[in-house]
Amino acid sequence: MGDSQSDEPEGDIAVQTAPPELKRPPLYAVVLLNDDYTPMDFVIEILQQYFALNLDQATQVMLTVHYEGKGVAGVYPRDIAETKANQVNNYARSQGHPLLCQIEPKD
């Protein structure tokens, strides 16, 4: 049989697929904004409860908010940052405080 076809490939060609390039998600800072009515102790409570800061860390962030007008409570991917900001805003309202929390893109 002169024209038989073989199941074996003619050349050894190796195709190597590149692993997908995974990028880290963009990060957002959860920022507390100063106001003239929310007690400092309440801000510290928020920072401990929602951002797992110890008393010293929470106090430092609270003082930054108080003296500079805003302070970063934590940095997270967008979904988590939005959730934390919403939780803080809802809790502050439920306790009768005007504290505002927002997210900002992290540089």
UniProtKB/Swiss-Prot annotation:
InterPro entries with a match to the protein in the record: ClpS (IPR022935), ClpS_core (IPR003769), Ribosomal_bL12_C/ClpS-like (IPR014719)
GO terms under biological process: protein catabolic process; proteolysis
Function: Involved in the modulation of the specificity of the ClpAP-mediated ATP-dependent protein degradation.
Subunit comment: Binds to the N-terminal domain of the chaperone ClpA.
Recorded family membership: Belongs to the ClpS family.
Organism of provenance: Acinetobacter baylyi (strain ATCC 33305 / BD413 / ADP1)
Protein name per UniProt: ATP-dependent Clp protease adapter protein ClpS
